[in-house]
Amino acid sequence: MCLHWGLCNLARIAKLGDIRGGYNYVKLACSLLDKLESRECASEVICISTQVVSYVEPLQATLEYYDKGCAAAMASGDIFQASFNMFLGHTSHFFAGMKLQTTREKGEEVIKFMNARNVLIFNIPVQHMQNMVLHLIGLDEEPKDVSAGEENISENMKTSYYFQKLYISFIFRMFDDTKAYAEKFLAWNVSNTWVNLWVSYSFYTFYIGLVSFWVARNSRDEEQWYERGNKSKLALRKWAETSQWTFENKWFLLEAEEAFCNGNFDDAKVYYEKAVTSAKTHKFVHEEALACELAAYFYLEIGEANKAVDYCLLAHEKYQEWGAIGKCTSLFKYFEG
């Protein structure tokens, strides 16, 4: 810890497993920042510390920190840090389950800001996130840099590129594409430890877990995918210890999917309901919708059609509340089929 600048690099202790310890260092760093009036690095301290704070405080409550970080960067003339805060803020805005139209508008503002200042390093991953938003809303348009072929994607953009492909394939139930992009995402991120430093890593872990249990139920290399799903589940369970608000519902949903895989249907029923209730309590409407949808597939599989329909209708209602009209259409087509 640098007492002169109030820098919070020691908050990285949280990434070694001591999240509470890292959180305490973050609070100390931010208090030093205020006390010493360190304007030059304020935006960086806020941006980096928010990555740790997000593992303790409700995710929705952390969104304002990125706005503060951006304002601090602009006050000191640091366009790079302003863009960095905007990029990470937009990502958290999506994962926090804010209304999709609002997230879309926020993304457009971020892209416009970066284009005007030629900040390309964060522009493209923001466009990848926008592509997910547009698909969910039900629009055919794509941000201009998203349509580029995989071979044209630079190395440092592959994490966001593969994840948006994986996410869209999973949400719209395209099994083969989901499996293929999950394999590419996992292969790339084995050697890309930098991505593990950001709170978005926890959401990557969550979706990889869901994908893994789905693939495990439907492929010959079941054991490998089951192990991946279990690894994700254990990670979410650990994070739920420091932030029940943000991670409990995700952990419960992975427990449900694992129980489904193992044929423990009674346990699966309990955990699906827990996942739905927790997501509702903690105001993650998009994950409440997802938990209902996956519960519907489960009940359909075990022959309880009426229960499946109930969960499908609730999933549709919650996706609509989120603004995911494209997903609503896809969901009804799937169950009609």
Describe the function of each predicted region.
Residues 16, 24, 42-47, 257-263, ...:
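Leucine-rich, hydrophobic repeat-scaffold detector
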Residues 30-34, 71-74, 112:
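HEAT/HEAT-like alpha-solenoid repeats
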Residues 60-69, 73:
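Active-site/ligand-binding-proximal alpha/beta "capping" segment
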